[in-house]
Amino acid sequence: MARSHDTKGSGGLSQRQLRVGEQVRHALAQVLQRGEIRDDLIERTVISVSEVRMSPDLKIATCFITPLGSADPQAVIKALASHAKFIRGRVAPSLAQMKYMPEFRFRPDTSFDNFSKIDALLRSPEVARDLSHDDDEDGGADEAPRNGDE
């Protein structure tokens, strides 16, 4: 009986894509941490690899990075992209079990920006006012008396 590997309907990645993506992320982070890439910008920038998403055929690894500090994210991505084949070769020994070594594509990780926007929205006076207004309307409905506690 064949299993269905179609994840398009569920909108998520397969377990294999997630596992391989995490292995690639770990191997890439080690290469960056050891300073194996000879590029002035990359050497003087601390780069966080927050996520690696693998294509369904595991041949393309989209790496989401965040340069920490004042480095321009687009400049760091351009530098990493210019060294993508070198990085691929350095990551290969850590991923020897893979049939094909993935092609690396680098993208800026904007999730941290999204988190800070949401946090700012939640802390805004309008939202605080609405939340306090909702609590007043409930009238303590969340705290129903228990048996014997009346």
UniProtKB/Swiss-Prot annotation:
Biological processes, Gene Ontology terms: maturation of SSU-rRNA
Matches recorded under InterPro entries: KH_dom-like_a/b, RbfA, RbfA_dom_sf, Ribosome-bd_factorA_CS
Residue ranges, annotated region (Disordered): 126-150
GO cellular component: cytosol
Record's signal peptide: none
Function: One of several proteins that assist in the late maturation steps of the functional core of the 30S ribosomal subunit. Associates with free 30S ribosomal subunits (but not with 30S subunits that are part of 70S ribosomes or polysomes). Required for efficient processing of 16S rRNA. May interact with the 5'-terminal helix region of 16S rRNA.
NCBIfam families, A to Z: PRK00521.2-5, rbfA
Entry protein name: Ribosome-binding factor A
